[in-house]
Amino acid sequence: MSRNFLNEDFGSEEEDDDFNPAPAEDSDEEDVKPQSTSRGRINEEEEDDDHADVKPERADREGSEDDVKEDIDADEADAGGERDEGEDEEEGENDEDDEDDEEEGEEEEEDEDDEDEDEDEDEQDVSSGRPRKRRKRLGGVHNFIDTEAGVDEEEDEAEDEEDEMEFGAEMHPDDLDALPAGADTDDRRHRQLDRQRELEASMDAEKQAQLLKERYGRNRAAATDAVVVPKRLLLPSVDDPSIWGVRCKAGKEREVVFAIQKRIEERPPGSRKPIRIISAFERGGAMSGYIYVEARRQADVMEALEDMSNVYPRTKMILVPVREMPDLLRVQKSEELNPGGWVRIKRGKYQGDLAQIEEVDTNGLDVTVRLVPRLDYGLNEDSGAPVVDIKRKRPGMASGGPRPPQRLFSEAEAKKRHGKYLSATSGLGGKSWSYLGETYIDGFLIKDMKVQHLITKNVNPRLEEVTMFARGSDDGTSNLDLASLAETLKNSTAEESYLPGDPVEVFRGEQQGLVGRTTSTRGDIVTLQVTEGELAGQMIEAPVKSLRKRFREGDHVKVIGGSRYQDELGMVVQVKDDTVTLLSDMSMQEITVFSKDLRLSAETGVDGKLGMFDVHDLVQLDASTVACVVKVDRESLRVLDQNGSIRTVLPSQIANKITPRRDAVATDRNGAEIRIGDTVRELYGDQRSGVILHIYRSFLFLHNKAQAENSGIVVVRTTNVVTVSAKGGRSTGPDLTKMNPALMRSGIPGASMGPPKSFGHDRLIGKTVQVRKGPYKGLVGIVKDSTDVQARVELHSRNKLVTIPKDVLIVKDPVTGQTLDMSRKGGQRVPYGASAAPPSGWSGGRTPMAAADSSRTPAWGGASSARTPAWAGISGSRTPAWKMDGSRTSNPYDGSRTAYGGAGSRTPAWNAGARTPYDSGSGSSGFDAFAAGSRTPAWGGANAGGRTPAWSASSSAGSGNRDSRGYDAPNPGGAYSAPTPGAYTAPTPGASAPTPGAWADSAPTPGVFNAPTPGGLSGRPYDAPTPAMGGAAATPGAGAYGDGEDGGPRYDEGTPSP
């Protein structure tokens, strides 16, 4: 070895400076054999010997490898053999050369950054003969064996070559012998990883993000560009797998799909019995009860669903057409729910109620909401009701009781009946209570619900609903989150909210502050024309979410929707952000609504009518209740009834509208008269005052302009008010003239009192009447009730009750339809001794009395000129005249005779056989039986036929006594004459209780033997029954007339007979 060492040429410093690391670059190539500069300095003989010594050892250790591996191993073995021989001098020279090379390598590393890694590898190759003492100082390999041993086996051959070249330089020979064969102990990658981490830690975050974007973003974008495919090519075709609809149990669709997924995991493709379906899904909603399976064949679907519960593959499957597949697989974007948003409840006790989102679970399926509770605190519980198992009750079958109103939770109310179900719970903020298994915080119900049980679209919360959710602050004021409310409303704003011409304002975005008027709307984009600023006259587009309607104080607007004040008209009094406060034209109250629910209105007032009903109308709700209309809505009326209660009724629930009576009068507490239009004040209570609008029995409906509640209408009792001022300056004191009977007498002082008024039951009630004028002219009905001037008539044709004045009614016979005279009471006579007046058989027919000549109507007797009609003597003022003219209408003694005697104008006249009903011969004073058979009807006897009514001959018939003429044939029959039928037979009606009587102390109706209607046997000269018999005037009558010359009716000769 000494000879070889001496003969070796170490070169000069210039050659060291010209170190060329080119062979190191070729070491990465597998086909090129690496060359070492240090090995080139050894002669070929020595190199051949080294190779010969190492080959058997490598054959035993690693087996056959490629040529590059063998050369590298041989060099390492040669270096180890030299160290074993103990050639210290050669090691010293090599050590010096290595140190020089390392210094040169460090300089090269600083100058050439691109070749840093290759130079480092060459230096390690040259320094393979480093002394063990120095290698010990560098540390062992135990820190790197566990992490690198299993990694390098998977590297390529070039990396293995580099590691083996470094192995001898980095490892001590003793450590090298302890390693297993093929172990890799390189720590270069660890040091490289450490350097990379230090570089990233010192790198700026923005620069690091830029590097990541360049590294990954470019690749992703390139991949996207390469996969652009027209959508029409993605549509399914007949070559794609088919989709089959399979029936399943409703509500179990998701469970069936999960069961299919589990079965696919148990029997994956490639197993003994794989599941050959491609996919399975369900749609729910309207398509519940079916699952959809994608497969090539129907047999694959049946095999996959065999023996699976809740699904029925044996039933008829539905093959989805190819053109319907895209609709079946189209996925709609779910509504994003955020805390603070507004939703509505779909079902249950809180159906339709507004709720605020408190929290949304990470899965997006469960939501915690805040509700205004509906609790009755056990007030509607029925302790005697049967116990019902809640679990067995069908869903949606709630209790039949009314739904409690919305109000905040009250622990005081809950303690009254359900104290055992109430408990306080600890919370982070506010009062928290647990009641009947529910949690209440600050009076609100906190409830967990599924998203499918909520309405998330078109919620349209009203301002009055949101006001209930206002949170109270420490200073007592309520805080309302209008921002979240406005955001919810913006999401549900439809196109019809903005119409052309609406003034709008942009309140967010780049165009904030622009004011204009809308020209068109397309989806969520509104086109508007700018009216103010530098862009005036230009057309711009803005999203609906950035717009709000713009109003000024004093504008007259109309509420168009989204609020319970819909169709209200009013004037804007305040504008604040999205809310507008206006003064209603109808109720004169301030209401607050959103600007999106308003629109400029050209109307200056409010119609206030719903059909035939208007504000302040008096209506009849039922038989005993009336009310005054205080507000008219679109479909209902708000009324204030006589008891002071406010009701909401439909027009169909109102019986009728009461027409106000201008002459209605009542008395106040002091007895003074009060009428419509008077101003009164309440004496006790709230001491309200107002103008009388309606008077109904003992109730007054007042109108107070200073009161906004109920449109200024109040109801009071007449006994609780006093008059403040009368309409037109009328005296408010009691009417004294009506309180003095002497001043109420009519006629000349000293004259007799007029006929008394009728009291008690009105004779008109129950009569059949006909209306002779007015809107109901010609209609017939029955009088059900009446007052002094009006009557309540039930019309036959309309089957309804109407109020009609009495003066337009005519009493009709319900059978014949003839008009009846109700002005005369007639009829009943007063028996002898029953009255202070002189007894008379005809006393019942006197009008009004028989004592004084001047008061008789018609008057008679003497020569008084006050008789109407006058008679006696040769006076020509009789109306109508009588004696020889035949047109006399009444007789001074029995004035109901109609036309007889004298002239040919007698009605009816008779002579010979035409006489009706009896007697013959004008001027005959005796009884005339006349043998003619023309009497109608005559009755038995030699000369008589069917007299009507029958009569009887009497010895006194021919006497001049007026009473004796009572047996001549009056109408109806006279005394002892036969009624119809037959004489002396049973009358119709009988004689036991006639009304009125035929003679003194009796009054048959009509009587047997003496049954006039009315009439009697008395010969009292002043009696004048209508009609009468005996001495009275019949129609045609019988008896003595005039001055007694005549014993019966006179008949002129020559009267034709029938």
From Swiss-Prot:
Disulfide bond entries: none
Compositional bias annotation for Basic and acidic residues: 52-62, 185-202, 1047-1058
Task performed by this protein: The spt4-spt5 complex mediates both activation and inhibition of transcription elongation, and plays a role in pre-mRNA processing. This complex seems to be important for the stability of the RNA polymerase II elongation machinery on the chromatin template but not for the inherent ability of this machinery to translocate down the gene.
Name the record gives this protein: Transcription elongation factor spt5
Organism of derivation: Aspergillus fumigatus (strain ATCC MYA-4609 / CBS 101355 / FGSC A1100 / Af293) (Neosartorya fumigata)
Domain of life per record: Eukaryota
UniProt lineage: Eukaryota, Fungi, Dikarya, Ascomycota, Pezizomycotina
Pfam family, one: CTD
Residue segments, region Disordered: 1-202, 818-923, 940-1058
